[in-house]
């Protein structure tokens, strides 16, 4: 486990898991939200985003936290390990709501409310995004170590095992 991606619905616990995994493995952690977003709440271009991701790929070790569905296959080709968070929608909405008002390493600003468009993305994740992710995982299942968490307890148990 040297090149890791952590994917799944926003609010599922990906970032918390990635941070704990980083502490255990000492692999450098990169947040896709921090790559994409600028402090003024705008974002870089897709081309620049792709170039920055490729710069991370060139490193010998990394954990990449985040979805950005357009680039999941690009990251799947480069990683050796995948952690997918497939948690209930209600848990993800609660997780996204609970982080409002808290500083985050992966965002250059403080969220003050749950954006309705973002909440809609979370509500539709299982229907719109997850099937595509599972199809990609099926494609790479013989080449990658794939771990799927259905609860935060499962991710906590995994971290306990690697201590």
What is each stretch, according to the model?
Residues 6:
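Hydrophobic anchor at the beta1->P-loop junction of P-loop NTPases
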Residues 9:
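P-loop (Walker A) phosphate-binding loop of NTP-binding proteins
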Residues 12:
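ATP-binding Walker
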Residues 15:
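Walker A/P-loop
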Residues 24, 124-163:
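NTP-dependent small-molecule kinase module
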Residues 28-82, 87:
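Conserved nucleotide-sensing/catalytic segment adjacent to the nucleotide-binding pocket
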Residues 87-129:
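A glycine- and Lys/Arg-enriched "phosphate-lid" helix/loop adjacent to the NTP-binding pocket
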């Amino acid at each position: 486990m040297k090149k890791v991606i952590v994917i799944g619905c926003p609010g599922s616990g990906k970032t918390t898991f990635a941070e704990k995994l980083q502490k255990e493995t000492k692999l450098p952690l990169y947040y896709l939200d921090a790559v994409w977003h600028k402090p003024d709440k705008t974002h870089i271009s897709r081309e620049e985003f792709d170039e920055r991701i490729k710069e991370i790929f060139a490193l010998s070790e990394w954990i990449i936290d985040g979805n950005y569905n357009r680039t999941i296959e690009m990251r799947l080709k480069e990683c050796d390990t995948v952690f997918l968070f497939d948690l209930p929608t209600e848990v993800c909405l609660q997780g996204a709501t609970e982080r409002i008002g808290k500083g985050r390493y992966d965002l250059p600003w403080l969220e003050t409310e749950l954006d309705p468009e973002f909440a809609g993305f979370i509500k539709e994740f299982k229907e719109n995004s997850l099937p595509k992710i599972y199809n990609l995982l099926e494609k790479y299942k013989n080449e990658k170590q794939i771990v799927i968490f259905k609860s935060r307890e499962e991710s906590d148990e995994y971290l306990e095992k690697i201590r």
